[in-house]
Amino acid sequence: EKFNIESHLFPVHQHNEHEGAEKVLTYLAEGKRVALVTDAGTPAVSDPGTKVVADVREHGYRVIPIPGASASVTAVSAAGMAPEGFTFHGFLNGGKKERAAELQKLINSGRIFILYEAPHRLEKLIDELSEAVPADRKITIARELTKKFEQIDSLYSPDLHEWLSHNPPKGEYVIVVDAASASTEETLTEEDRQWIDELIPLLPAGQLSSIASKISRFPKKIIYNYIVSKKNSQATVD
């Protein structure tokens, strides 16, 4: 009212976030822009919004975070991960063994964790994450947050090297690694498995899971886990 801004408002809270996410996706499909705001705290960090952000990103829409108290909080708000808290670690230091031990400790903590990295060391960190992070953990890589060339990408460890080949290191990085996923009873239908199996040899796991999620309506993580499991079983047989 103070700035005479007129727009349609609707509430999103812990009891209706699924419906709220669907409404947001409907508006985006119509070519509209949507702002997720709170009267206190940061959306998807201190307040509800994780489901909305995750669904919007899964459907290929861009999420632009408003500058927060720090780069870590800003990155988490745009990552669309679970809101149960996170561990900020910053830069991994020390030699190869010390870094590997510290990274494994973070992975085993059961919490989302945040790393910082400089461009000239990014390739080294990508190597370490590719080797250590389980294939079903989402990794969000953000660079140049709140600046002109801001970039936020979410992927999984098997796709990190391919991502790096298309994104030469530039700017300062915030890396958010998801916690271990809870077990789920959702499984793909036999029909979906059949056509996904046909495409597994032709497309990277991340790209295929993104496409299949839009077609089948199953979460990308479930499809990605199926693809990785299928590839591993085929490798064992071979």
Task: Go through the PLM ranges and name each one.
Residues 6-13, 63, 84-90, 136-141, ...:
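Short hydrophobic/aromatic-enriched beta-strand-loop microsegments
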Residues 11-17, 69, 90-95, 144-146:
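Short, acidic/turn-prone active-site loops that include or flank metal/cofactor-
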Residues 1-8, 77-81, 87, 95-96, ...:
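RNA substrate-binding interface of SAM-dependent RNA methyltransferases
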